[in-house]
């Protein structure tokens, strides 16, 4: 994934794949991905999937705005000039989405490693979120960085259940 595009077909979410900078759009169907994996295996190449979260999610949030905090008054901007591009991992809908997408992509890719991004989250992206603030209080999490550590451990545990090793930037 990237700000402007989601190039992998996802069965259970609205169609936003093929969006982005390419004038022709485009995406990889699950059959395309399976074919690419077979070709890579013939060449002894492993393909590492990447779902770049929690930031870099502008395109995703255009079709699934429920994954962000609707009442946050913070305007965050990342290095790519996209505003408010970060999902809110404290929301139940976001947790469901994370489990679902990581499971679906893990099932497609038989290789050991799975990349989850984790770079360039705007520093203030979560500080105005009432749900994150409440979650931090309830779980004795002291800072945004500690909350991000909670998030990455949550993702690592999802992927461990699928026998994947997590990679980050």
Residue ranges and their predicted role:
Residues 95, 99-169:
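Gly/Pro-rich turn-and-neighbor structural signature
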């Amino acid at each position: 994934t990237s700000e402007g595009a989601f190039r992998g077909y996802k069965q259970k979410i609205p169609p936003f794949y093929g969006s982005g900078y390419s004038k022709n759009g485009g995406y990889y169907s699950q059959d395309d991905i399976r074919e690419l994996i077979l070709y890579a295996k013939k060449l002894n190449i492993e393909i590492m999937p990447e779902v770049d979260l929690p930031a870099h999610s502008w395109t995703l949030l255009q079709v699934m705005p429920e994954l962000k905090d609707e009442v946050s008054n913070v305007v965050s901007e990342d290095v790519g000039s996209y505003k408010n591009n970060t999902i809110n991992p404290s929301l139940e809908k976001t947790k469901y989405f994370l489990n679902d997408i990581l499971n679906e992509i893990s099932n497609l890719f038989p290789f050991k490693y799975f990349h989850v991004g984790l770079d360039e989250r705007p520093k203030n992206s979560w500080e105005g979120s009432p749900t994150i603030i409440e979650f931090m209080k309830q779980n004795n999490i002291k800072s945004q960085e500690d909350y991000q550590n909670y998030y990455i451990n949550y993702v690592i545990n999802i992927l461990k259940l699928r026998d994947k090793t997590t990679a980050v930037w």
